[in-house]
Amino acid sequence: MKQQKQKIRIRLKGFDQGQLDRSTADIVETAKRTGARVVGPIPLPTKREVYTVLRSPHVDKKSREQFEIRTHKRLVDILDPTGKTIDALKMLALPAGVDIKIKAA
């Protein structure tokens, strides 16, 4: 029989690209330090949302202003995680501007 390989897939999302890259580097460094193999970080497509609003409160339909928000995403796969890897990832403090989703397979 084949041995079942364990894998942890971590998806990170954030508006600030620098903060996201630092968080990803922290996760990769923590996983490598505990002896797990790491695939990534893989940059996923950036979602760009543009909002257009009128500048004036009453008239002047031609005068508009546009705002945009970009959501950057990264993917990290941790292959063959040990118990130390999972404990170290639980103790890792990430900034508030980074959303993290962890899926074990």
Curated annotation (Swiss-Prot):
PROSITE patterns: RIBOSOMAL_S10 (PS00361). It comes from Chlamydia pneumoniae (Chlamydophila pneumoniae). The keyword Ribonucleoprotein applies. It holds the Pfam family Ribosomal_S10. HAMAP family: Ribosomal_uS10 (MF_00508). GO terms for cellular component: ribonucleoprotein complex; ribosome. Part of the 30S ribosomal subunit. Keywords: Ribonucleoprotein, Ribosomal protein. NCBIfam families: PRK00596.1, rpsJ_bact. Belongs to the universal ribosomal protein uS10 family. InterPro entries: Ribosomal_uS10, Ribosomal_uS10_CS, Ribosomal_uS10_dom, Ribosomal_uS10_dom_sf. Involved in the binding of tRNA to the ribosomes. PANTHER family: 30S RIBOSOMAL PROTEIN S10 FAMILY MEMBER. GO terms for molecular function: structural constituent of ribosome; tRNA binding. One of its GO terms (biological process) is translation. The gene is rpsJ. This is Small ribosomal subunit protein uS10.
